[in-house]
Every structure is written in structure tokens, then in C-alpha cells.
Design a protein with these regions (language model features):
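Short conserved segment of the HATPase_c
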Residues: 168-180
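A conserved beta-strand-to-alpha-helix junction within the catalytic ATP-binding
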Residues: 75-90
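Short helix-loop "hinge" at the ATP-lid/N-box region of the Bergerat-fold HATPase_c
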Residues: 135-136
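Short alpha-helical Gxxx[C/S/T] motif in the catalytic ATP-binding
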Residues: 195, 199
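Conserved micro-motifs of the catalytic ATP-binding
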Residues: 69-74, 114-119
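Short alpha-helical segment of the dimerization/phosphotransfer core of two-component systems
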Residues: 49-54
Length: 230
């Protein structure tokens, strides 16, 4: 069982590092081509951020291997989901607007500055980054992705990621969160089937729920996370 845990964590780590490495590569390519000082400064910030993200991932997963437990609730604190979402969206836009013409929009449906949840900041960042990476992977060039933050009648905060991609082929969308499950169309290349499983595990860690569906009004997918009251 210990070997199985180690293998699972190692596989997850490889998958998680691949995302910031892709971002590093893209940012470095754009940095090499652009002469715009403001854009170069922003790209350098993204490079530094991704390096820190890789370092954090290695540290976190090493600790998980040692302890064979996820993160304890003692490490959680009250954090502003909107600020975290804005930071991740800005980083992704800096890369993918230039590289593929994909625009990510952050919509605050209640026009609030603060959406507090009880959680671990870098893990919430990881959730949003993985969802955006998944949407981008399924989207054609020059498409839009929306990140929506809302609060329901029970004062629970809702985070949604909606894209204009291929949507889910699977009618039972709960399966998409299974480890190694992939419903990616063949023309979208090889896919490990780990990204959404990692998201699901992190969502569970925060006592939140996650659901996926196809957009009814238009083509694309919709992933919704509901966080408990902080």
C-alpha cells in the first residue's frame, strides 16, 4: 500500500509540474520575441511565479510522501477567492492571449470585492489553474473562457469555469473526475486523465463540492465548485 501511495503521488507530481513548465516555455518564447518593456516585465513575473509554483509542488508532494496524508485543516485560513482568481486569470491571459488568441474573463456576478472562503491559498490557485489548463486544452484558438464568482441564497460561494470547447462526451460527467479517465477527443492529443482528478481531491480537501456539465445555450463545458461558508 505504501508503494502504491508513492507511485500515485509521483504520477501526480509529474503531471502537475508539466503545466507550469509549459507556461515557462511559452513565456520564455514570447519574452524572446517581444520588445515591449511592460510585457517583458510581466512575462518575467510569470516566469518567477511558475518557478515558485514548481518549487512549492515539489515541497508539498515530498511532504505528502513522508506523511502519507494530505494537508491538515490547521493550515487553512480565511482567504479572498476573488483575489486568487484574478491573479491566476491574469497570468494565463498574459500567455494565451498572445500565443493562441484565447481570452479569459473574470466575472463577479455580485460586484463584490471580497469572497472569503476557508482554505489553502496555493491549493485554491492550483484548482483554478488546472481548470483553466483543461479548458484551454479543449478550446480552439481565439475562443473565450469565463471564470465566474457568485454567492447563492445560502451564502455559499460558487466558482464556475465555462469554455467554448468540445464539451464532455461522457453522459455521466462524474466519471471525468476519476483518476486516469480522459474523454479528450483523439485530435486533441495525448492526455493523462489526472488533472481533474487532482482538482477533485483538492476540492474534497476543502469540504467543497464539484460538478461538471455541458453548456446548454452553446457548445462547451461548465465546471462548478461550491465552497462551504467560511
Amino acid at each position: 500500500k505504501r508503494i502504491s501511495h508513492a507511485e500515485n503521488f509521483s504520477t501526480d507530481l509529474v503531471h502537475e509540474i508539466r503545466n507550469p513548465l509549459t507556461s515557462l516555455k511559452s513565456a520564455s518564447e514570447i519574452l524572446h520575441e517581444t520588445e515591449n518593456h511592460e510585457q517583458r516585465t510581466k512575462l518575467i513575473d510569470i516566469l518567477n511565479h511558475d518557478v515558485q509554483r514548481i518549487e512549492r509542488l515539489i515541497t508539498d508532494y515530498s511532504q505528502m510522501l513522508k506523511d502519507e496524508v494530505a494537508l491538515s485543516k490547521e493550515k487553512m485560513k480565511k482567504i479572498n477567492l476573488k483575489l486568487i482568481a484574478r491573479s491566476v486569470v491574469d497570468d494565463f491571459n498574459s500567455i494565451y492571449e498572445a500565443k493562441r488568441g484565447i481570452t479569459i474573463i473574470l466575472n463577479d456576478l455580485n460586484n463584490k470585492e471580497e469572497y472569503f472562503i476557508y482554505g489553502i491559498e496555493n491549493r485554491i490557485e492550483q484548482i483554478i489553474a488546472n481548470l483553466l489548463d483543461n479548458s484551454i486544452s479543449f478550446s480552439d484558438d481565439n475562443k473565450k473562457i469565463s471564470v465566474e464568482i457568485d454567492k447563492n441564497e445560502n451564502e455559499m460561494i460558487i466558482l464556475k469555469v465555462l469554455d467554448e470547447g468540445k464539451g464532455f462526451r461522457e453522459t455521466n460527467t462524474k466519471k471525468i473526475f476519476d483518476r486516469f479517465y480522459s474523454n479528450r477527443p483523439d485530435n486533441f492529443g495525448e492526455h493523462s486523465g489526472l488533472g481533474l482528478n487532482i482538482v477533485k481531491n483538492l476540492v474534497d480537501l476543502h469540504g467543497a463540492t464539484i460538478n461538471a456539465s455541458n453548456n446548454i445555450a452553446q457548445k462547451g463545458a461548465n465546471v462548478e465548485i461550491i465552497f462551504p461558508k467560511s
